[in-house]
Design a protein with these regions (language model features):
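Cytosolic ligand/metal-binding cores
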Residues: 1, 5-8, 126-152, 246-320, ...
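An anion-binding catalytic pocket shared by soluble metabolic enzymes
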Residues: 35, 40-50, 196-286, 301-307, ...
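Conserved hydrophobic core element of enzyme catalytic domains
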Residues: 325-440
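A residue-level signal for conserved active-site and pocket-lining positions in enzyme catalytic cores
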Residues: 92, 124, 191, 245, ...
Length: 440
């Protein structure tokens, strides 16, 4: 069985963001994924895996094989177990289309691709001052070492940057958005569902320097996860406030619902006042409790009886310019299920869909005029030992050869007003725009 060549390096000092992002420079396919203390970077494609409702396609070099899907989670696990490579890590995305598949809805405008993954040719795994270099081919280890030496000489100082001004883009599609909010409120009042998150796509006037945007945005945020990935034609940078699902090698499942928000300013006294307000706002508390209850119900469907516990409840989490109420749940995955069953059960995050999920997902597909694609889906890693880590794709910036955009949304309930919800999305666009660096 094939193995990665590996080499550990201990640095004299921790790498800064500019150095770390520099390891990705000039690559066709890559994914940088920050998970707590570890930053993992997969570069180049050794194996490509595309998943739709109908089939799983595996590409290794020029060899292509396909597996018909009978039961998605079981079939995907079976395909991955057949990979002839030791201790691999897979990087990839789950599109919002997974939610429609999971709840038995036609893909509609979301398209057929559910997952896209790649197992990289080379990798860096960075943890503090320790760096692990990995390569399928021994001769590429020299390239990895050389690149690492180059970026270590590059201190954290930037050339003059041109920030993208939000300008008129914050008002993009104003009347459309107010109309769909009103439609959502009407459907909630008629009893179709309790809550739905409705979003609008906002095109940007300039192409972006995604490397500088990632560095600048990461400095301004305290995310649960961050990522910068380029896969095929799509490039995405994001600062995720929460994970949809985490599964460790011992089959422990975790999820981390956030609901309830206040601003986070530069004034500690103001922040303390807002935090206290958040902890005593009955509407925010009720909204959070409903989200935790739904997460618990979903966990119980895939975890062993009596193993699901709330390990943290209603803690205040700081995320850049906002603070949220956050809770954490843990359970033990049932013996006959795998990590993909856990992800599919918890996907999409209630934060980005609504309550009940199926009815909210159906409404999103019907009311919003454009497909979400990766927005409100997941960027993730998956290891050969079954470990999975899936970040929620919010607070993200997207770019292809044709366009650059952000997408913002708001949670709609029966008391929502179109004007207030539109203002909330304006605030989110303005907040994101402060982190964007235009391409020169």
């Amino acid at each position: 069985m094939k193995k990665y060549y590996e080499k550990y390096t201990h640095l004299s000092k921790k790498m800064d963001l500019n150095m770390i992002a520099g390891l990705c420079g000039g690559r066709k396919n890559f994914c940088l994924y920050e998970n707590g203390e570890e930053i993992a970077i997969g570069i180049g494609t050794y194996i490509d895996i595309y998943v739709s409702a109908a089939e799983i396609m595996i590409k290794t070099g020029k060899k292509v094989s396909k597996v018909e899907v009978q039961e998605l989670c079981t079939d995907l696990e079976r395909v991955l177990l057949q990979i002839e490579l030791e201790n691999w890590r897979m990087y990839g995305i789950a599109n919002f289309s997974l939610s429609r598949y999971t709840y038995g809805l036609e893909s509609g405008k979301e398209g057929e691709e559910i997952f896209h993954f790649f197992i990289p040719e080379t990798e860096y795994r960075i943890c503090g001052k320790d760096v692990l270099l990995r390569s399928i081919e021994q001769e590429k280890m020299v390239e990895l070492e050389k690149k690492l030496e180059e970026v270590l000489e590059n201190e954290d100082n930037f050339p003059e940057q041109e920030f993208l001004h939000s300008g008129d883009i914050i008002n993009y599609d104003e009347e459309y958005y107010k109309t769909i909010v009103a439609d959502g409120v009407d459907e909630i009042k008629s009893g179709k569902y309790q809550k739905v998150i409705l979003s609008r796509k906002v095109p940007l006037s300039n192409r972006l320097n995604m490397k500088e945007t990632y560095i600048n945005g990461r400095k301004a945020n305290t995310p649960a996860r961050s990522y910068w990935c380029k896969m095929g034609t799509l490039e995405v940078v994001g600062f995720s406030p929460e994970t949809v699902a985490e599964v460790d090698r011992d089959k422990n499942v975790y999820t981390f619902p956030l609901a309830g928000t206040r601003a986070l300013t530069k004034d500690p006294d103001v922040n303390k006042k807002l935090k206290n307000e958040l902890l005593h706002d009955t509407k925010e508390i009720a909204e959070h409790a409903v989200s935790v209850k739904l997460a618990e119900e979903e966990m119980k469907q895939v975890c062993e009886e009596d193993s699901v516990v709330v390990t943290e409840f209603m803690s205040v989490m700081e995320r850049g310019t906002v603070q949220h109420l956050g809770s954490r749940l843990r359970g033990k995955l049932k013996a006959d299920l795998n990590s993909w069953h856990a992800l599919c059960k918890l996907f999409p995050a209630v934060t980005a869909s609504g309550i009940p999920k199926k009815e909210a997902i159906e409404a999103i597909g019907r009311i919003e005029k454009e497909p979400r694609g990766l927005y409100s889906g997941s960027v993730m890693t998956y290891d050969s030992d079954g470990s999975l880590d899936a970040a929620l794709v919010l607070r993200s910036i997207f770019q292809t050869d044709e366009e650059s955009w952000v997408r913002v949304g708001a949670g709609i309930v029966d008391m929502s007003g179109p004007e207030r919800e539109f203002i909330e999305t304006q605030e989110k666009v303005s907040s994101i725009a402060k982190q964007l660096i235009a391409e020169k």
